[in-house]
Amino acid sequence: MFDPYLDELNKLLIVNHGEILLVPDGLQECYSKKQDAVIRSWLWSVPGFRRWRVTRMDVGDKLQVFNSVAYPDYLNEQPIMGIDLLWFGIKNKLVAVLDFQPLVQEKSYFDRYYQGLKSLKARYSDFNSKDNVRAYDLSNYFSPWVLLCKGDLFQASSSLPFVFSEFLNAYFDISNNFKKYNSRIEPNRVKELQISYDIYSSAHDPAHGLFKSYFGKQWSERFLKEFLFPHSIAKDKT
């Protein structure tokens, strides 16, 4: 179900001069020993970004997962990009969460970087869900305009393709023009905030339990610390 989104993102990263990097050994692909499931991940080097990761999990008709997170360079204070798409085939249920995840919860920061996301939120009512998704703590590292959809096949086949494309374009519009935003957060502080994001996310990642159930605790712990949120390791060593 989500392969077209993977292809679209890959093409966009290539257009923006992205290059594939090596994923830590043993984490680029894993097959479940208990169930018919596979997870694959990619890491990109993209100008203007410190790290751009992508993950695709395939459990056939039962479950489909697509995730991507982009970390801007430390010289760029723009939000972290986060995408989570989940399709529960047995229940015909879509959960989609797309956001420019803010480094700080400040009005001036929102005024600088969220006009595009605000516009998307206003135009796509399907992604303006008032219901929180239990797995996500929307009070931390989410913006007031997070695109949240709890839908079914109708939303998955109608509005999601357009939201996905426009969301990516809005995010790249910020990065391609970041100099005009007059970044006000110093690079060292941006680094600290991105480290804090990884530390928090590694402790609260809603997908970690899912990964453990399919791929085991040992592999999932490595995946969490070494691929998903590698900056969280700094805390473990202090």
Swiss-Prot record:
Reaction equation(s) it catalyzes: 15,16-dihydrobiliverdin + oxidized 2[4Fe-4S]-[ferredoxin] = biliverdin IXalpha + reduced 2[4Fe-4S]-[ferredoxin] + 2 H(+)
GO molecular function: 15,16-dihydrobiliverdin:ferredoxin oxidoreductase activity; cobalt ion binding
Matching Gene3D superfamilies: 3.40.1500.20
Keyword NADP: no
Key words of the record: Oxidoreductase
Pfam families reported in the protein's UniProt record: Fe_bilin_red
EC number: 1.3.7.2
Family: Belongs to the HY2 family.
Name the UniProt record assigns to this protein: 15,16-dihydrobiliverdin:ferredoxin oxidoreductase
Species per Swiss-Prot/TrEMBL record: Prochlorococcus marinus (strain MIT 9211)
